[in-house]
Amino acid sequence: MKPNFSKGLIPAIVIEEGTKDVLMLAYMNEEAYEKTLETKRTWFYSRSRQSLWNKGETSGNVQYVQSLYLDCDQDSIVVNVKQVGPACHTGEKTCFHYQII
């Protein structure tokens, strides 16, 4: 089974192996998905830069892919990772650290 990239990008929800904490949300195009499968590290597509990026390539805060889950519509994916260092560029463990209610 493979994601449906007919719209170009799919959301990739990244969770931490063990805790299942949601670490971040990013987007993958087909090339990022294939590179993720090939390298077992997360690759995403930057909508602002319009280019691929490898999580942790410059910061060292890499994500090692443990498993991938495809949703029922085949248009979003959950990436289960072993996270090295913080996932968020702010230095927080997760990008979801602002509590609203």
Swiss-Prot record:
Subcellular location: Cytoplasm
Subunit and interaction comment: Homodimer.
Name used for this protein in its record: Phosphoribosyl-AMP cyclohydrolase
Catalysis performed (reactions): 1-(5-phospho-beta-D-ribosyl)-5'-AMP + H2O = 1-(5-phospho-beta-D-ribosyl)-5-[(5-phospho-beta-D-ribosylamino)methylideneamino]imidazole-4-carboxamide
One of the Pfam families matching this protein, by short name: PRA-CH
GO biological process: L-histidine biosynthetic process
Pathway(s) this gene product operates in, as recorded in its UniProt entry: Amino-acid biosynthesis; L-histidine biosynthesis; L-histidine from 5-phospho-alpha-D-ribose 1-diphosphate: step 3/9
InterPro entries xrefs: PRA-CH, PRib_AMP_CycHydrolase_dom, PRib_AMP_CycHydrolase_sf
Its job: Catalyzes the hydrolysis of the adenine ring of phosphoribosyl-AMP.
GO molecular function: magnesium ion binding; phosphoribosyl-AMP cyclohydrolase activity; zinc ion binding
GO cellular component: cytoplasm
Domain of life of the native organism: Bacteria
Lineage of the organism: Bacteria, Bacillati, Bacillota, Bacilli, Bacillales
Gene: hisI
Annotated positions binding Zn(2+): C72, C88, C95
Cofactor(s) demanded: Mg(2+); Zn(2+)
Organism: Bacillus cereus (strain B4264)
EC number from the UniProt entry: 3.5.4.19
List of residues binding Mg(2+): D71, D73, D75
